[in-house]
């Protein structure tokens, strides 16, 4: 039995960047934000997986993929001083032979955990990933994937 395309099986939600509260401003990332995001990501790495640290080149590579639209596929939370508190990326890598997968990456600076930033970020990532699945003409399974370090 043939499956219908994902666009006929998945309903696209309304996707909007989170709104700020408590001095937090959300916006899409730009390449100019890489160093600020790296600072946040290195604190996350130190707390969650100290034997593996994200390096600048990895972030640059993620931001430069032809299949990443920074304006639509990223969300970053900043404090009033411009410090990154949380960041997220949704990417759909090529090679969709057996499934269409949306990978949800990012995290929350350890000192800012417990404020609800992660819940807001994940909600946005799930919506954006679902929106991307709903735009696919593929007749494959669709997955939203994320990874947890503990």
Which residues are covered by each model-predicted region?
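Conserved acetyl-CoA-binding loop-helix of GNAT-fold acetyltransferases
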Residues: 114-131
